[in-house]
Amino acid sequence: MMIRNQLYRKCIIGGGRSILNGWVINGTVPNIGLRYLRSGIVTRSNEIKTLEDLSKLKNLDDVDPELIRKLINERTSELNIQNEMEMLKHIQNEERKTQDIPIKRFIRPTWMFLLMSSTFYLLGHYIWWKLEYDEVEKELDRQVTALEEELHNLIEEHRVHGENEAIKNKKHKHWYKFWS
């Protein structure tokens, strides 16, 4: 009796099924209609568990709208969860990519740094060697000039000393030894 009243209310309010449109007589639903509804709707609602089962039906008129809404909401929530999982995976992959910096990005700058630092080192080493060479050359030049002065002094001394001896020897030399 309760099912009859619910079906009657749905038909009167407009939320009923098209199957009942011709079966409501004086506010009651005949037993034949109830049997049909029970056999069709109840068994179909038991058979319909996914949207795929719903898509296999030829007509959606005899399917409870609450069941359709429930199936759509379930499928929507499943798809939302899948999308969120894919988005999380995508975000994690992007984080890994940003954290795992490839070595290829650093190869060229590393070579440039090595070449520039080697060039600066060689230039600095050359300048240092050149300054050291100039310093040693100046020191050796000073030694050469000191030795040259000493040599000139010795030569001068020897010449003066040699002239004195020659003068001494001339004085002691006899006049006749000139021709001999």
Curated annotation (Swiss-Prot):
Gene that encodes the chain: INA17
Main localization is: mitochondrion
Lineage, opening ranks:
Eukaryota, Fungi, Dikarya, Ascomycota, Saccharomycotina
Which parts of the chain does the record assign to the membrane side Mitochondrial matrix? 37-105
Name a single GO cellular component: INA complex
Q: Which residues lie on this side of the membrane: Mitochondrial intermembrane?
A: 129-180
Membrane-traversing stretches: 106-128
- The chain's coiled-coil residues are 129-163
Reply yes or no: does the keyword Hydrolase apply: no
| UniProt keyword annotation of Membrane present | yes
Q: Which UniProt keywords are present, listed alphabetically?
A: Chaperone, Coiled coil, Membrane, Mitochondrion, Mitochondrion inner membrane, Transit peptide, Transmembrane, Transmembrane helix
Listed under GO biological process in this entry are: mitochondrial proton-transporting ATP synthase complex assembly
Provide the membrane topology annotation. Single-pass membrane protein
Q: Where in the cell is it found?
A: Mitochondrion inner membrane
Transit peptide stretch = 1-36
**Name this protein carries in UniProt:** Inner membrane assembly complex subunit 17
- Quaternary data: Component of the inner membrane assembly (INA) complex, composed of INA17 and INA22. Interacts with a subset of F(1)F(0)-ATP synthase subunits of the F(1)-domain and the peripheral stalk.
Similarity comment text for this entry: Belongs to the INA17 family.
Role? Component of the INA complex (INAC) that promotes the biogenesis of mitochondrial F(1)F(0)-ATP synthase. INAC facilitates the assembly of the peripheral stalk and promotes the assembly of the catalytic F(1)-domain with the membrane-embedded F(0)-domain.
